[in-house]
């Protein structure tokens, strides 16, 4: 699994003109991608990493300060544009494999005590955010 994680002051995701998930205080936005070899162990590991990653103000984590997370699925994290002019998506897991794993990341975070908002899997989404720092990291588990 891959996640692009951004420290944000606020973020929201909109589908068909309606806000479906938002955080209105400092926290993390995680864009999450799934590949064919990922399973429940990777989803649990990513959730723990997101919850304890010390990239908030004063080197704190979401678990330290109770900061919220906005988790948005993004299969394009496994796009490959090394050849030609058009990316391929062969490394991205298909929806029936990826969706339950993204859901598991969210469920694991909530079980750890996190406040989590989400996008809508497979939907065309608009993501708005204010990146603090800016601070963006790539996680791979």
From Swiss-Prot:
Stored NCBIfam families: D-aminoacyl-tRNA deacylase (TIGR00256)
Keyword Transmembrane helix in record: no
Function: An aminoacyl-tRNA editing enzyme that deacylates mischarged D-aminoacyl-tRNAs. Also deacylates mischarged glycyl-tRNA(Ala), protecting cells against glycine mischarging by AlaRS. Acts via tRNA-based rather than protein-based catalysis; rejects L-amino acids rather than detecting D-amino acids in the active site. By recycling D-aminoacyl-tRNA to D-amino acids and free tRNA molecules, this enzyme counteracts the toxicity associated with the formation of D-aminoacyl-tRNA entities in vivo and helps enforce protein L-homochirality.
Domain characteristics, as noted in the entry: A Gly-cisPro motif from one monomer fits into the active site of the other monomer to allow specific chiral rejection of L-amino acids.
Enzyme class: hydrolase
Catalysed reactions listed for this entry: glycyl-tRNA(Ala) + H2O = tRNA(Ala) + glycine + H(+); a D-aminoacyl-tRNA + H2O = a tRNA + a D-alpha-amino acid + H(+)
Protein's GO biological process: D-amino acid catabolic process
Gene3D superfamilies: D-tyrosyl-tRNA(Tyr) deacylase
Location in or out of the cell: Cytoplasm
Motif placement: Gly-cisPro motif, important for rejection of L-amino acids: 133-134
Record-stated family: Belongs to the DTD family.
Taxonomy, superkingdom: Bacteria
EC number of the protein: 3.1.1.96
GO cellular component, one term: cytoplasm
Pfam families membership: Tyr_Deacylase (PF02580)
InterPro entries from the UniProt entry: Daa-tRNA_deacyls_DTD, DTD-like_sf
Species, as recorded: Thermobifida fusca (strain YX)
Protein name: D-aminoacyl-tRNA deacylase
The entry's keywords: Cytoplasm, Hydrolase, RNA-binding, tRNA-binding
Subunit-structure text: Homodimer.
């Amino acid at each position: 699994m891959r996640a692009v994680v951004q420290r944000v002051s606020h973020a929201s995701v909109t589908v068909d003109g309606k806000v479906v998930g938002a955080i209105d205080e400092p926290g993390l936005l995680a864009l999450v991608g799934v590949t064919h070899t990922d399973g429940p162990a990777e989803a649990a590991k990513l959730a723990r990493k997101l919850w304890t990653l010390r990239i908030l103000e004063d080197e704190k984590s979401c678990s330290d300060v109770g900061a919220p997370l906005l988790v948005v699925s993004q299969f394009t994290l496994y796009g490959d544009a090394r050849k030609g002019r058009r990316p391929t998506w062969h490394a991205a897991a298909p929806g029936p494999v990826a969706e339950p794993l993204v859901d598991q990341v969210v469920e694991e975070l909530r079980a750890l005590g996190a406040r989590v908002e989400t996008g809508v899997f497979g939907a065309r989404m608009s993501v708005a955010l204010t990146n603090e720092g800016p601070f963006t990291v790539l996680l791979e588990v």
